[in-house]
Amino acid sequence: MSDDKRAKPEKSKYPVNLLDTPFPMRGDLPKREPQWVKQWQDKQLYKKIRAARHGAKKFVLHDGPPYANGDIHIGHAVNKVLKDMIIKARGLTGLDAVYVPGWDCHGMPIEIQIEKQFGKGLPVQEVQSKARAYATEQIARQRKDFERLGVLGDWENPYLTMNFSNEADELRALGKIMERGYVFRGLKPVNWCFDCGSALAEAEVEYKDKVDLSIDVGFPFAETDKIAHAFHVPLAQLEGKPGWIVIWTTTPWTIPSNQALNMHPEVEYALVDTPRGFLILAKDRVEEQLKTYALEGTIVATARGDALTEVRFHHPLAKMDAGYVRTSPVYLGDYVTTDTGTGIVHSAPAYGVEDFQSCKAHGMPDSDIISPVMGDGVYASTLPLFGGLSIWDANPKIVEVLRESGNLFNSHKYEHSYMHCWRHKTPIIYRATSQWFAGMDVDPVDNGPTLRETALAGIEATEFYPAWGKQRLHNMIANRPDWTLSRQRQWGVPMAFFVHKETGALHPRTPELLEEVAKLVEKHGIEAWQTLDPKDLLGDEAAQYEKNRDTLDVWFDSGTTHWTVIRGSHRDELYDPAADLPDGRLADLYLEGSDQHRGWFHSSLLTASMLYGKPPYKALLTHGFTVDGEGRKMSKSVGNTVSPQDISNKMGAEIIRLWVASTDYSGELSISDEILKRVVEGYRRIRNTLRFLLANLTDYDHAKHALPASEWLEIDRYAVALTDRLQKEVLSHYQAYEFHPVVAKLQTFCSEDLGGFYLDVLKDRLYTTAADSKARRGAQNALYHITQAMLHWMAPFLTFTAEEAWQIFAHGTEHKDTIFTSTYYAIPSVDDGDTLLQKWHEIRTVRAEVTRQLEAVRVEGDIGSSLQAEVTIAAGGPVLAALQSLEDDLRFVLLTSAAKVTPAPEGGDLLVTVTPSQHAKCERCWHYRADVGHNPEHPTICGRCDSNLFGAGEHRSHA
């Protein structure tokens, strides 16, 4: 270890062993980290690690791909650093911990960028070409930032969902799930964004407050006789006055599409006589609603909802235009509530999931469903009264027309939580369109369990970190609708079907044709579908079929990467045949933010359940979102965002890594300037400890100077036993993917166990005993083992610093290039370790009390440093025995010039007496001793220093 070390030039007549190290006190991280990243790239560090682990058991953390658009933000940094720490921690156990980074490349955000740059209306092929080029540029930018964070991985060969092979294999996955009977086409209300012009996945929907017009609308009685019968009142009583069943809604724009009314079968409904006419309302809502309508009223009769089933009412706009002359029947629904509104729900099956299900359950054919809202949010021109208006602009006009009709009972502004597109931040609607779905509850062709059943069983077989994620994902799968696979976009993997022009049926050879298209895509990308002439595959049948123009949901892109990447493009690196065993999984771990329970975790579970009948992962790990120091969500408008690039340039990426590691990622991760300042202070403590260790190992060569543990001094054996105990805790935390306890314990170890005790005691022996004495070499043995262990503990999160120190520490050894080809250090066993841990715990407790008493005397001005003092300790029991066993070495433990132990009176407490020393100070060791000047040739040093410099050297037994 001494090849590139240097000792400070000694000027003193009585030198001490003060050594230097190339490991600087200041990390200078912003300047030096980029140099290290370049070195790692130049020497292909990741490949060296893979070569070192060749043949070892694999550990696969499959990367959830970030989207290839824009610079990385602090959330990206958290995610990538967490993954990197886990990969490195697992790799240091000897596993072949592979990391292939990936990117999600298709989809709407990139299409939007192409529109912004080049305008709308480009040919599809040109959009795809420009989108591919744009994504490539974005990936290069993001990759540079990820590598800057010290993240090691196969950056030269990442997976991209837009790679031709991945696009082709995605089509093959679609073919497989079709063959197994999960895919169908149908008319259903789906989340629809007018700005996207496309259906949205559940994961693409967010909720924000929105102010809408809330209206109470009356549907006039159409079958008065049936109403009289249901409420058991004479028909004549109802015939003299008008009557309405009243609904409440916050979506006036759906009224033109009303086709039914929903009532709860078991709720009591009231027939209320008012000056305006008869009203039907839920009995529990009568008082509240009449106040709202400014009406007095009397309940004439009541009836349960099921008594009114199939009774019909006139459409409220029938008087205003003949196009609305129709009636709406009452259908029963358990989902109707009486918490708010009237207890009656108006049903527009084209624009509500429950509305649609209710109408379909009552036999309404798809062709009868009224759906006037077009994909851009504008009513079809053929819609009476409101054609050509956007639905949002139509709302106030609809209210006005209802008022004119005499059927409006109330309208007011109403704030509520409403669905928005996560990209455009604009309101979305449910809209019935013809789409391709993966059925959650359809029977697969093998008559096995449904997709929902398979996925729920898979959740039970998955580990969750933290544990609450299990119930969250379970609830989402248990309650989700069918998965809308199709999108009406251009930059996406095509649903490459041939559809019969007249019947709409798929070509009978669809699985075979999908494989043919996949082969073309493998060579030319998804662009091949655009240029494909159906005749090339269908021959004479081409005239009867047309190409489907839908693309696959981008969540299907990333959700099938276990198929397209682990089994496909990166099979050699990632695939383990054991994954195909009944309990096998393709990945050990998926790790993402908590939003991915409804995103990537979710889509990956569904696709794997359809393809293999089990999850793709053994475990799911979830981290929280970043917030500022006050717990507020990061927002550009608030101005509280924190840029990882800025932190790296000002403080160093190591500080980001340490912040991530020191934060409990299972909750929100707070970050601010003040928090980062504390992280920097913690980093300096660790770095200073490392510097001390490395400096005092400068002249140590383990091959020459190693000693068996039995020949070390007692305090050295204690320190190594303490290190061994901590290592067991550290490795246990790493196994459970816990980092913040490791950081906390490492910092405590550095500041209290080492800096506050062991190294403090050790300085005298390291500096003053003979350089090659057993006392000093024994101390260096302990320091060597502690440093080995410590560097491995910190390497997963303090990667730059651990590697920097390792280059100095491991110079000339087998793993000199990188700490990451080695494994966690096997700390030598200390036979009496448990006994020493207990004994020295008691000694340290006494030392803390002595230090407190010394400080009190120092504050009084009676002493300067603790070496100016002599102490007498009165103690009893095991404490007395422990202190007495140290003999004269006790003074070195207490950092005093003399220490004496006496038995305490029976039952007496520990008593510490501090006395200023009356002796002279040794120029060399600074102890105040009676024998200073005993050798006239060296009148300024003590007998111990005289012996260490010119004689046989002092004897140490314990410390």
From Swiss-Prot:
Keyword Electron transport: no
Subcellular location as annotated: Cytoplasm
GO CC, alphabetical: cytosol
Main location: cytoplasm
Keyword Metal-binding applies: yes
Location of the motif 'HIGH' region: 66-76
Database matches in Pfam families: Anticodon_1, tRNA-synt_1, zf-FPG_IleRS
Main enzyme class: ligase
GO molecular function, one term: ATP binding
Enzyme nomenclature, EC number: 6.1.1.5
Keywords: Aminoacyl-tRNA synthetase, ATP-binding, Cytoplasm, Ligase, Metal-binding, Nucleotide-binding, Protein biosynthesis, Zinc
UniProt: ATP binding residues: 636
Record Gene3D superfamilies: 1.10.730.20, HUPs (3.40.50.620), Valyl/Leucyl/Isoleucyl-tRNA synthetase, editing domain (3.90.740.10)
UniProt cross-references to SUPFAM superfamilies, sorted A to Z: Anticodon-binding domain of a subclass of class I aminoacyl-tRNA synthetases (SSF47323), Nucleotidylyl transferase (SSF52374), ValRS/IleRS/LeuRS editing domain (SSF50677)
Sites where the protein binds Zn(2+): 922, 925, 942, 945
Cofactors: Zn(2+)
Domains as described in the record: IleRS has two distinct active sites: one for aminoacylation and one for editing. The misactivated valine is translocated from the active site to the editing site, which sterically excludes the correctly activated isoleucine. The single editing site contains two valyl binding pockets, one specific for each substrate (Val-AMP or Val-tRNA(Ile)).
Family as reported in the entry's similarity comment: Belongs to the class-I aminoacyl-tRNA synthetase family. IleS type 1 subfamily.
Main function: Catalyzes the attachment of isoleucine to tRNA(Ile). As IleRS can inadvertently accommodate and process structurally similar amino acids such as valine, to avoid such errors it has two additional distinct tRNA(Ile)-dependent editing activities. One activity is designated as 'pretransfer' editing and involves the hydrolysis of activated Val-AMP. The other activity is designated 'posttransfer' editing and involves deacylation of mischarged Val-tRNA(Ile).
Protein name, UniProt field: Isoleucine--tRNA ligase
Organism: Cupriavidus metallidurans (strain ATCC 43123 / DSM 2839 / NBRC 102507 / CH34) (Ralstonia metallidurans)
Gene: ileS
